[in-house]
């Protein structure tokens, strides 16, 4: 049976008009939240809380989501200031993760802009809840202590994010972009134990743990030549002894070891461990390997990044730019190593202004900050709506994720 061209065009026109109406309703719903989200942002900014102590922010966000009909777990993975809020649209469907941070910096308050995230993510979640016309499960996560104890890492280890189909975050920035790659990280304290003695009267009776540390540093310099060029290894001495006239029976050095590949990093870490064991052996000390935390690398899903950045441009986010080529490590990678995920970074400071600075802090309650909250919410919400309403798009993103992960 031959399809009538005029009917086909009419069907397409009706579909596009309906989709445009849904998008317009979604954006209008989010915009209607501007005033309340600004109030929330300003409250967070004026009441900065350190990691795992974000009780005020936790209370504000969970109360808000509960008032919108979300079912809220107010403690997750043993973290008192973590939460999980769930809403099933039309009985539930693909699980969409929306993550936010809200911890501040000691002495600098919200100089990393985490005050923006909760309002932006909640605005996206509420807008979607009120307007979505297809089955979906919206899951908002409060993830504490990004700056210190890495709440997402704790939650990821317990499988909290494993059932998500896709995950999103928002962060302030000096331009509007998406996160590219991030580096896998192992943060370790390497502790050497020796034997104390009087350094002048009987040094031969001592075993210097500090000597082991110094030998370890020398060994690391030789190791650098034999690891991939993208590997980063940097360390400090955190304890070198108590007095110069005592042979130190204890010394400690802390190291950050990074690579763009978790598999490659695991291999390098084993070699670092051998260097430490060798340093201890040379002086007769013992070595204790204390791993503080380990981040995976972010798995980059180009199709998802492109989609998110396209929608950020559609909603008018300023100063669109390509992803950063050089980056550090983040606990969000503990999520994106498990499920497809993307972080939309929205401009609210001038180009070249870095986070953890006074200038970044000074912009926390400006009009630019308020606008960034809205741009982030709208860009992420439009992306979620497009994924849920475009046949095959989610499956393609998940396939791209698996292929990208296989390349690391």
Regions found by a protein language model. Give the residues of each.
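Metal-dependent amide/peptide-bond hydrolase catalytic core
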Residues: 214-408
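Phosphate-handling active-site elements
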Residues: 72-73, 93-94, 125-141, 220-231, ...
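Divalent metal-coordination and catalytic microenvironments
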Residues: 44, 98, 114, 140, ...
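Buried hydrophobic packing segments
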Residues: 61, 120-128, 151, 212-220, ...
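Short, Lys/Arg-enriched N-terminal segments with co-localized hydrophobic residues
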Residues: 5-22
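Acidic/His- and Gly-rich active-site-bordering loop/insert found
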Residues: 20-135
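Non-cysteine beta-strand/loop elements that form the S-adenosyl-L-methionine
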Residues: 97-99, 193, 343-349
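Histidine/acidic-residue-rich, glycine-tolerant segments that coordinate divalent metal ions
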Residues: 81-88, 103-111, 115-119, 134-250, ...
């Amino acid at each position: 049976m031959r399809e009538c061209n005029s009917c086909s065009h009419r069907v397409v026109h009706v579909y596009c008009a309906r989709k445009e109406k849904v998008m317009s309703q979604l954006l209008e719903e989010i915009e209607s939240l501007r005033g309340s989200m600004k109030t929330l942002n300003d409250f967070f900014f004026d009441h900065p809380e350190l990691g795992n102590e974000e009780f005020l922010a936790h209370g504000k966000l969970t109360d808000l989501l509960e008032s919108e009909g979300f079912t809220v777990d107010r403690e997750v993975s043993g973290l008192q200031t973590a939460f999980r809020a769930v809403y099933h649209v039309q009985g539930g469907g693909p699980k969409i993760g929306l993550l936010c941070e809200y911890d501040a910096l000691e002495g600098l308050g919200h100089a990393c802009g985490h005050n923006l995230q909760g309002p932006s993510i909640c605005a996206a979640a509420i807008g979607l809840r009120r307007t979505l016309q297809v089955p979906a499960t919206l899951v908002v996560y409060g993830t504490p202590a990004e700056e210190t104890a890495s709440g997402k890492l704790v939650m990821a280890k317990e499988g909290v994010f494993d059932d998500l189909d896709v995950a999103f975050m928002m962060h302030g920035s000096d331009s509007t972009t998406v996160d590219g790659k991030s580096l896998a990280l192992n943060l370790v304290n390497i502790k050497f134990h020796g034997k104390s003695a009087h350094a002048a009267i009987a040094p031969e009776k001592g075993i210097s743990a500090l000597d082991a540390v110094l030998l370890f540093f020398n060994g690391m310099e030789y190791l650098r030549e034999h690891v991939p060029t993208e590997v980063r290894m940097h360390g400090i001495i955190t304890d070198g002894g108590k007095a110069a006239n005592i042979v130190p029976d204890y010394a400690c050095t802390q190291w950050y070891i990074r690579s763009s590949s978790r598999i490659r990093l695991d291999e390098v870490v084993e070699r670092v461990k051998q260097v430490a064991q060798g340093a201890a052996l040379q002086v007769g000390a013992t070595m204790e390997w204390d791993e503080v935390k380990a981040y995976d690398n972010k798995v980059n899903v180009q199709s998802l990044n492109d989609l998110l950045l396209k929608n950020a441009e559609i909603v008018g986010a300023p100063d669109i730019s390509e992803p950063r080529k050089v980056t550090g490590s983040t606990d969000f990678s503990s999520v994106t190593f498990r499920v497809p995920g993307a972080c939309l970074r929205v401009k609210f400071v001038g180009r070249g202004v870095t986070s953890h600075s006074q200038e970044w802090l000074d912009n926390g309650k400006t009009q630019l900050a308020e606008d960034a909250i809205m741009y982030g919410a709208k860009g992420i919400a439009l992306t979620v709506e497009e994924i849920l309403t475009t046949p095959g798009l989610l499956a393609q993103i998940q396939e791209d994720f698996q292929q990208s992960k296989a390349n690391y």
